[in-house]
Amino acid sequence: MTGERLSVKEFIDIYHSFGDRSGDDFRILFDIPPAFQSVSTLAGNGSGKTCGIRNIIGVLSNGDISICGIGNVEKELLLGNVRTHSLESVWKFDETIRMIREDLPGKLGGVCRRCMFKKSCMGRCIAHTYHRTGKLLDGDLFCGEAYRLGFFPESRLI
């Protein structure tokens, strides 16, 4: 059905059926956490890495400062505006930025806390998690659902 989300199992099955198969003229990108990726995929193209959330700051087109582009939809994650705040002071002293640098990945919740990829994945997209739950460190929602349903790879837990 158009517009409906795939179930976790459907998405994992599709990923496994296509795997690393990309043609010469195209590449298939799956938005799937590294815990579900094959070793060859992880080794071959550097997948499994975070967006760099601990080392970035977002400046939106109106000058607003946020942790990333999520500030466009989550006003609670706006940290100031370049017209009134220096990027340096936001980077050094903002409580949200400080929390991200200090608490990721150690205070991630859910299955992320036990995942062998937590130091590189860092909860995949904490902005998306915030958008859905109101909490930055809740852990990746896809992984959490997969774990609850018994689809999270046990071999990726520590």
Describe each PLM feature range.
Residues 154-158:
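Iron-sulfur (Fe-S) cluster-binding modules
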Residues 72-118, 122:
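Membrane-interface junctions of multi-pass transporters
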